[in-house]
Amino acid sequence: MANAISVGVAVQLVLTVLLASIPLRVIWNLFFHPLSYIPGPRLWIAFPIFRQIASIRGVFDAQMCEYHRKYGNAVRFSPNEVSFITEQAWRDIYDHRPNQLERFILSTTRRPDIFDANEIDHARYRKAMLPAFSPKGLQEQEPIVRGYIDTFIERLREVSATGESTDMVKWYNFTTFDIIGDLAFGESFGGLRNREYHFTISFTFEAFKLLSYLEAGAAYPLLLKILMAFTPQSLIEARDKKEEHAETTVRKRLDNRALHGRGDFMDYLLRNRGEKQGLNDKELVANASTLITAGSETTATILSGITYWLLQTPNVLQKVTEEVRSAFQSEADITFTSATSQLPYMLACFQEAFRHYPPVPTGMPRVTPSHGITKISGYDISPNTKVSVHQLAAYSHPDNFHRPREFVPERWLPDAKTNPSSPWYNDRRETVQPFNVGPRNCVGRNLAEQEIRVMLARVLWNFDLELAPESKNWTDQKTHFLWEKGALMCKLHDRFASK
């Protein structure tokens, strides 16, 4: 009996301590925490579960934009997370520095790819990949890319002939995934051929939506176990099928000697295979899969975004269309080189599109060292704090850009940068870094930029576009690390149809 009473008293004592610790923790986080001097939403700081709920609902990034407009350059949005929107923060968080801030990894088991790798392996993977994105590599890959863009234009011409509206998001995705699939695996996903998504691509879209749940699970392990218990078996099977497809396709590419020397990604990655600094077969599979995700969905996203904003800004659309059609004698003249050197206004349009609709709208967290204070954009940040530059908030903040809600490519032209009388002179253009900065910046930036420029230039060369009424508010989207894009319905008028 005495033992039973003792157990009961012990349980009550434990429960009392636990219940008492909640308000104490809230008070500590709000008023005594080393980061308490940085403003932010008190509800999220006191009860960080609400920050996770916002992510799961797909409204986190929109709310972060509001919080930065309310609180300023630095926002503390959970007990140990701080977001910034300044140029200096890009340098302090992501750039080369003596004590490099580590990338925050959701998974406890790192995949052997360039995203999840530690600093040593990341440098090794990057060294193996860089030649593929060099001028020589791009020159070898351009014929492959051009072939898919040719097919892309043919498909749009077929759709145009029907007189019906079409979803440009799908066509951009079909094309970019086919291109990157061929460059990484030696074969396309058949999107342009079959006019539908390959199962691995459909899984990729769904998988990004799960990142918010994984992030919540990292903060609340019990919640993760509950969520995993309710994960649909079909999703798990799709993941396994995707990984099996990647391994099988890479194996087939390795065995196909006819493709050796074609200058694609795998060709370059294989050059040091078996050597100490080279990639083993497991790393080849993981990095090929990563390149496909990173080099396709984001590329299609910016193409979709610039298409929408051009159609919403008729004077800009007219100006860039005239530039494209007057710069070349024929469509064949639109190449990687010419689309970059002869279309300055189109390049400015892309810069403005990246500002309005960055493919990765959120922040990419880094973790401050476990000892000492880290200075970020003038703020003293305590150890083990997750810090980031929130891209959408930074790019849309009035402190960084004059009339930020307007689509104005002129802010990126030389006159705006050098003429003090320009209304855009004081815009903080270095704040816009969609490809990141520092040692983990986008390794495929050169290819992505060339690809999107040629694709858009050829669309504008061939077609007059019209936004369908149902897509008028297309940018009203949720975000789950990437944008949850709906259909971008457009009507295409083939300017050569009657010729």
From Swiss-Prot:
Keyword check for Metal-binding: yes
Protein's pathway: Sesquiterpene biosynthesis; trichothecene biosynthesis
Transmembrane segments: 7-29
Other information: Trichothecenes are sesquiterpenoid toxins that act by inhibiting protein biosynthesis.
Main location: membrane
Record carries keyword Protein biosynthesis: no
Topology relative to the membrane: Single-pass membrane protein
Binding annotation for heme: C442
GO molecular function, one term: iron ion binding
Cofactor names: heme
Annotated PROSITE patterns: CYTOCHROME_P450
UniProtKB keywords: Glycoprotein, Heme, Iron, Membrane, Metal-binding, Monooxygenase, Oxidoreductase, Transmembrane, Transmembrane helix
PANTHER family documented for this protein: CYTOCHROME P450, P450, PUTATIVE (EUROFUNG)-RELATED
Family: Belongs to the cytochrome P450 family.
Glycan attachment points: N173, N287, N473
InterPro entries: Cyt_P450, Cyt_P450_CS, Cyt_P450_E_grp-I, Cyt_P450_sf, Cytochrome_P450_monoxygenase
Pfam families xref list: p450
Subcellular location: Membrane
Task of the protein: The biosynthesis of harzianum A begins with the cyclization of farnesyl diphosphate to trichodiene and is catalyzed by the trichodiene synthase TRI5. Trichodiene undergoes a series of oxygenations catalyzed by the cytochrome P450 monooxygenase TRI4.
GO cellular component assignments: membrane
Protein name: Trichothecene C-4 hydroxylase
